[in-house]
Regions:
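Short structured motifs
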Residues: 38-42, 101-107, 128-130
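Hydrophobic alpha-helical segments of small multi-pass membrane proteins
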Residues: 71-75, 79, 102-106, 121-123, ...
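Hydrophobic residues positioned within well-ordered beta-strands of beta-sheet architectures
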Residues: 54, 101-103, 117, 142-144, ...
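Hydrophobic beta-strand-centered segment that forms part of the acyl-chain substrate-binding groove
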Residues: 84-124
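Hot-dog-fold acyl-thioester-processing enzymes
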Residues: 57, 61-81, 95
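Non-catalytic linker/capping segments at the edges of enzyme domains
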Residues: 1-55, 94
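HotDog/MaoC-like acyl-thioester-processing domains
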Residues: 2-16, 111-112, 122-165
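Short connector loops at helix/strand junctions that flank enzyme active sites
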Residues: 37-39, 49, 98-102, 112-116, ...
């Protein structure tokens, strides 16, 4: 890889475009340590270019109608947003506690297979601005959008990061 290519790769990595396997493993361990999350079988499926993917099996998230329980859909989307913000903060070398402040969910269709969610920053959000605010104030907020594969459900939530220490 020539110098310009290596520089672009380093910039992309530092700006949170690529996953750090150790951060992903630590996030998964944190998720699994929460009894409700462990019971739901939620797993991080990957992170690339600012998008976090999360999955959960239908068989432990099924309702009386044979499709995914709405609460499970809400949980997977909320947790995918939480994990996205946590991952990107970790990639930026920041330690923070991340909380969901508020959210809105639209259920559009039943889900009859495994739950697959993707989370990304809302289009009007600027990650660099978020990091600048976080660095200056020790707290910042950012809006994340998540969706269940196929458009079955959509989530928009505001997450708050509070610096540790």
């Amino acid at each position: 890889m020539h110098y310009a290519g290596a520089f672009r790769f380093a910039c992309a990595y530092m700006s949170g475009h690529f996953a750090d396997p150790v951060l992903l493993e630590n996030l998964q361990r944190t998720l699994t340590a929460m009894p409700p999350v462990a019971a739901m079988g939620i797993r991080i499926a990957g992170y690339d270019n600012g998008v976090l993917r999360m999955q959960a099996p239908l068989d432990v998230n099924i309702n009386d109608k044979g499709n995914a329980f709405g609460g499970s859909l809400a949980s997977v989307m909320t947790l995918s947003g939480w994990a996205l913000v946590s991952m990107r903060l970790g990639l930026a070398g920041q330690q923070a506690e991340v909380y969901v402040a508020d959210s809105n969910i639209r259920y559009r269709a039943p889900v009859y297979g495994d739950l697959l969610a993707t989370a990304r920053l809302a289009p009007d959000q600027d990650w660099d601005e978020f990091l600048t605010t976080f660095s200056k104030r020790g707290r910042a907020r950012v809006t994340v959008r998540a969706a269940i594969e196929g458009g079955a459900a959509e989530f928009e939530g505001r997450f708050v990061a509070l610096g540790k220490g």
